[in-house]
């Protein structure tokens, strides 16, 4: 499923996909299975409260491979690449992606799970290898997932960007390219304090896209990340 929002106002939430199971077992109890895979929410304009690549409301369901593209909308609360919203969820929210190019949003979750569900292997991309984050874009805290297990959660920083904070990522990758980088500014600026729960041994920098040739007596310096406060 794919939902594209280009304008107007949605006073609740926009969903790429929703999973509910209204079937009953032999004893008349609601079944608790049902997965959400490969759904997409594209936000190009308008105003919404929350956005979900997929919302899985079954207890044992999984959210996998769902995507959100934020490309100009205003999101008053949060974005969830893949979410398990059953209070006692036992499934996993894994392999979901949120791409941020422009617009405004509160917090961002690659994966989200209530109950015992896991939120691993999710990705958030700031910009792309060809497109910078637009000036004026506002983003709160970006979470790989809402759980303490951060295995394979990845934040890709492809452009200069300012966000509130980042949390619950195992991998942090900076891709530096002439077309998307202004070296006069920090690549990633945090505005609400020092980040936490990052494994700095997993920091990766790809500078193969920089073609600048500094003078022999000048160092070419790029400040990867700073804390505005």
Regions found by a protein language model. Give the residues of each.
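Extracellular beta-strand/loop-rich repeat segments of large surface/secreted proteins
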Residues: 115-118, 128, 133-228
